[in-house]
Amino acid sequence: MDTKANLMTYNTFTFKTEAQMLLFRRIWEDNGTALFDKLKKKGCTRFCLNQIWNMKGTFKISVLFEYDSPNAFKQSQIELENFTKNIMKELQAADPVIEASRNIVLQDLKV
């Protein structure tokens, strides 16, 4: 985790089928770099796309964003809303159940 980050969002997306999960993954793989380039300008310090693999029979992806300030979080949310509007049809086809959390970093230990 970036030492400058003091806020983060961690979202888990659960899908009914592997095909839906793979569609969602492709959407982020195709658009994630361009989106992060925009978010960096707003104060987002990290974007991480993950596939959860240790839960047999489930299809899950998680997304982590870290921000350097509360204002960076707010500005990034506006950019994320614009991003999702542009790809809403694809996102709806993936039909994820979303569990979103907003976090304040309390302790961050690293090697």
Q: What are these model-derived regions, one by one?
A:
Residues 13-17, 69:
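Beta-strand elements of well-folded, non-transmembrane domains
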Residues 6-14, 62:
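Active-site-flanking beta-strand signature of metal-NTP-handling nucleotidyl enzymes
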Residues 1-7, 54-57:
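Short, flexible turn/loop "capping" segments at secondary-structure junctions
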Residues 30-46, 56-57, 64-104, 111:
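An amphipathic, aromatic/His-enriched active-site/gating alpha helix that lines ligand/cofactor pockets
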Residues 49-53:
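Short, solvent-exposed loop/turn elements at beta->coil junctions and helix N-caps
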Residues 16-27:
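Short, surface-exposed ligand-recognition loops at beta-strand->loop->(often short) alpha-helix junctions
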